[in-house]
Amino acid sequence: MIRFGFAGCVMMMAVALRADTLENRFRELPRAARCNTGPLFWLHGDETPERLNAVLDKVAEGGNGAFTAESRPHKEWLGEGWYRDLGICLDAAKRHDLKMWIFDEDWWPSQTVAGKVPQQYAAKRLKGQALLLKPGARYDGNPAKDAAFVALVAGRLDKEGQAVVADSLVDLTPLARKGPVSWRTPADGEAWQVMVFSWVTAPRLKQGNRLSVDGMSRDCVAWFIRTVYEPHYARFGQAFGKTIAGYFYDEPETAGDWGTELDATFKARGVAWMPCYVAWLFTLAGEAQPAAKYQYAEARAETWGRTMFGGITEWCRRRDVLSIGHFMEHNRLYVHNDYCAGDMMLLQKYSSMGGIDAVFDQFVMGQRDTRRDAPCWQTPKLASSISHVYGKADDLAMCEIFGARGQDLTYPEMKWWADRMQVCGVNVLIPHSFNPRAPHDTDCPPYFYNGGFEPRLALYRVWADYTSRLSLLLAGGRHVCPVAVLFSGNARQVGAYTTPEDLTSALQDALYDCDWLPFERFEDGVTKIKGNELRLHGERYRALVVPPAEGITFAALEKVRAFFEAGGTVIGYGRLPERSLTLGKTAADIARLRETIWGADARPGKSACRTGRRGGRSYFLAEQPTPEALAAALGEAGVPPVLRVLSGETGGWVHALRRVDREGRDVLFIANQNTNDAARAFTFHAPDAAGVPEVWDAMRGEVTAVPWRKEADDVSFDLTLEGGESALVRFAKRDAGRPARLTSASRPVATLPVFPDASADPVVYPVAPDNALTVSPVTGSVFQGVVTVPPELLADGRRAYLVCDLEGRHGSPDTLRILKATYAAIDGAGSADVTRFVSERVRGGARVVPALPSILGGDPAYGHVKTLTVEYEDDGKRATVSARDGARITLRPQAETAAAVRVNGAYAGGFIGNPCRVNITRHLQPGSNTVRVEPFGVQNVRVETY
């Protein structure tokens, strides 16, 4: 019996393991495979338990694997009402097997503790007071009597009397700590300057006008964790690491530039603190100034990152949870002193993963340079680079996505945004939002459920399934990336510096992937030179790009030289570094290294500047390298792209991500972001790929074969993509006899019409009440049909697809009439009647009306938040729609190329974008079958079998 029982257990385990293959999870999407997709779920403190549970049920039905419980704001945040509502959320998460994240602020920005940060724990700024002393003069003072005293330093002025000589600095701080100081300048005939350093409370934040916690002082961070984090653990600790996944921070700022941990950072780095303090607030003479100021900026960022974000993450780690979130990244705020201490990467390296926010219309289908907040296009690469170069678990990187885009956000747009994130390596998507108050709210829609008044809710499941399947294959395993781009946000604080957005885009257009690699990560021992590769965690970079920067650290450029001499490929563009950002090293030291790499007289050009003895090559390209120029240089150096196009037109909108998955197989994600409807036929070439290419269809959950050829150590394959259709290609060990992938040339064995079902109960979407503040632009339409399927068409090996055509535009251009349009600040600060403005746009043929902040003035990010509300009549039906600043109102929307399908009452999948088909094989039964297609009108509904 014992032997039989043991054997039986082994057999059951084997069956379970077979059932839990990557392919099985991809097809079936169990809840655990969905945990990288999950929305913000808002809590205000005025919702009933019944309301919260009802909307959480919709979160689960929508195919999510997680949600973030966010105070928006909760009227009792950190009070009993807050914990009561979190308890309701936690019970629902357990019931639905969802992971739950906890928002760490009453609204945003994080680390303001609902505006209740005590002065003693608030962020600090360094203040300097200088006293000029003539030769032989004496300083008398007692600066340490001030509780905010930091340091007392003296230094000799240069001959011009404008700057302090770095090697003359004298530390008078120990004297000051003992009491009154009386100090006479040396008898050298030179003027001296005595500098008193102290701190003051940092200004209130730009968002919210609140004080924030000092992230550079351990006692302040300890108070913050004690006040915000520990009470949650005290109540819900048993769920930590199980149902509760961790905490989410939102848009913290870095108003402070000094804290009690700063000097420890200087000491750990072996950097003298005195010249750095002086350079930060005053001026050092000669080359020491940029180097010392840079070192202060780096130490500041490191201190804030280690103390605040490292402190939070370590607290979370000890309780088996994670710390995630995002800063403000758009418009280069990721290198802004007040938003991320000058370099977001140095702060967020201490979090559990990289993260960004993508909101308003920062991303627009078919556009890279948007009017709002540019540049934004490469912020996803910023997030994934943090995860890649700092070795975050499974290369997870997150994005809070779609916030304030407006209720007229379409599902094809959502897919397009998701493809952009995923191809850049961002694989945890947090949609914004499920709001229990909706539709009686205007707070940054879209609301995907909208209180039951959003007919497109069924499409959310289609989108969630799609992006969850992408994340399943594109997280874990190893990232395959040929290029590293050296990066330092703080180098921009002390001289000319070009951030890497344009270069990254050019590389992606040439089908080369890259990671942004901070100077300090490149310099440290974790990044190793192995022949012609840079090895970092799982990364194997074959080429290194040096940024167009006026200054660079000596250690970074010295390692660039070592990489070149070991056989690596080095690319500069625009300008080569001239200044040293390392104290004690000079421009002459930088010049010697630069000349070793690029030669003494490097000029921008196409050919290599130098070739090393071990095959290393250096290039110096134009200020804005084209994809063609980058591809030529890298190709000449023997660095292959992620993917080559042998035939077919990308239009500059086809990009690729390559990984090795958890089972050791190569995976390509080919993101086709062309927005027209034209199908494109490609022949691709995958360098160094091994195995049989299979297309894993993330939209339909099926695996198919494509024509392919083995070419030496590479693989070529043919792939046709519809407009906006992207593809996962996985290289299997052997030919598994997969069915052929369908194209427009494929012909079905049989086509069965699906007839309207006259006996079906009509489905009518509820109409939003008159007091609704956010109204869907879609009225909704449901097709209910019936189809009879002969048994022989369901034979083994046959595939059956539900196929349909979309009906197109709603309404007639002549039936739309604007009744009233109002633009008003939601805090009552002002309003304007803009009926005439909107009416004129509509008469001119426009169907999209932007919410314009210029009408009332002010910046939508920091001023009064305003809402545009339009009441209109279309084809005899009245409706009201609204959108906040930066979003758009769509009147008379077109039917989206999207559908959700049910067969015999069971959810069967759906599609977003072409091709308009769903694999329904396993849902069909011989004989009569019912079919439901929503939420847009369809025609020519049919079942095609292959």
Features from the language model and the residues they span:
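N-terminal carbohydrate-binding accessory modules
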Residues: D20-C35, E50
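Extracellular, modular beta-sheet/disulfide-rich ectodomains of secreted and cell-surface proteins
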Residues: S812-A895
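Beta-strand-rich ligand-recognition modules
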Residues: R809-P813, I826-G844, G858, Y862, ...
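Bacterial N-terminal signal peptides that target proteins for export
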Residues: M1-F6
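Carbohydrate-binding surfaces of carbohydrate-active enzymes
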Residues: A33-G38, T48-N53, A66-F67, W77-G115, ...
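Acidic/aromatic-lined carbohydrate-recognition and catalytic surfaces
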Residues: A69-A187, V196-A222
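Hydrophobic h-region of N-terminal signal peptides that target proteins for export
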Residues: V10-R18
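Short acidic/polar inter-strand loop motif in beta-rich domains
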Residues: A202-R204, D735-G737, F936-R942
